[in-house]
Amino acid sequence: MVSFRAATAADVDALVPFVNGGYRGESSKRGWTTEADILGGQRTDPGKMLEMIEGSAARVELAHDERGALVGCVYLKKEPDASCYLGMLTVDPARQAGGIGKLLMTRSEELARAWGCGRMRMTVISMRPELIAYYERRGYAKTGATEPFPEDDPRFGLPKVRGLTFAELAKPL
């Protein structure tokens, strides 16, 4: 059983290491969504996390198991064009492939619809075909839009490979 709630400023200290451990470093290698081979450094920091939690028309949604342990999170932001941006989907690497990511995706789409959004979009590192395939199985499709990875900004991580780009994926809601 997974329960959901919106993150608050009080969650920042737990969320930052949870997200960073889900994407980067040795702990992330326990799951299939690791970026450790292409990016080092952090995925987020306390300032960025607080900004996302307290942002206008935005939400960080938390998933907890039946014991109250944090098992996942996702960032959502309503955009001016009635789209919703989904980012930072994180599942505890030890709990991946157990349906938590799918539950977070479903919850995200429900929240976006409640906000009046008709489309969900996200950006994924292009070098992650297995992750892109995961989202495609959930109804998302590449839009053809790309953007460069911010290689010169260590707040987003330290590239181990040059020329990283993001591919945009979207799904009508």
For each predicted feature, which ranges?
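A short, internal acetyl-CoA/4′-phosphopantetheine-binding micro-motif in the GNAT/acyltransferase core
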Residues: 64, 89-97, 124-126
